[in-house]
Amino acid sequence: MSTKQKILDEALTLFAEKGYDGTGVDLIAERVGIKGPSLYKHYKGKEEILNALIDVAEERYDEMFGSEKNIGKIPKDREEFIKVTMERISFTMRDPMIRKIRMLLVQEQFRNERISEVTTRHQLDGIQRMFAKIIKGMMDEGIIKNDDPELLAVELTAPAVLQIAKSDRQPQCEEECMEYIEKHMRHFCKVYMKERG
C-alpha cells in the first residue's frame, strides 16, 4: 500500500473516532509512521485529505451501492428486488470504509458545507431519487402498482436509513436492524407489488 493510501486510511479512522477538528496532521503522520512534514509531500493539508476521502468514498459507493445516475438493472420480481436491495443495504451497513465515512459525515455535517451536502444526498435526497427511478421502472414493467414513485421511495428508504443509523450507534444491533429492514421491505412489496412474483 502506498504512503498516500496509508495516509487516507489512517485519517479516515482518526476522523471517524475523533472528528475532523480533533485530528491533527501530526497524529495522522504518526499513525502512518512518517514525520508530520513528510505528509505534506502527499497532501497540502488536512482539508485536502478530507476531500480525497470523500471523493474515494463517493466513487466506491456509486460502484457498490448505486446512485441516481447508476441505478443498475430494474428488478423483474419481488424476490430479485428484495435480494438486490438487501445486498445494497448490507454493503452500506457493513463495509468498513463506508461505515467510517458515514460516522465522519454525521459528526461533521453541521460544520462543513460539502459534508452536509454529501450527507443529505446519501441519507435522503439521492437515495430517494435512486429508488424512485427503480420503483418507476418497476411500475412501467407492471411489477409495482401505479402510484407516486417519489413518495413510495421515501416510504421504502426512510426506515432503512433509520435502522442503519441505529446500527452505527449500537453495532451489537446490526443483525436486528437488518432483519427489521428486510421485514419492512417484504411488507412494502406485499402492499405495493402486483401478485406475480
How should each PLM-predicted stretch be described?
Residues 6, 14-56:
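Helix-turn-helix
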Residues 117, 121, 135-187, 197:
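Hydrophobic/aromatic-rich alpha-helical bundle segments in the mid-to-C-terminal region
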Residues 52, 66-99, 150-156, 197:
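Hydrophobic alpha-helical connector segments
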Residues 94, 100, 106, 113-140:
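Amphipathic alpha-helical packing segments from all-alpha helical-bundle domains
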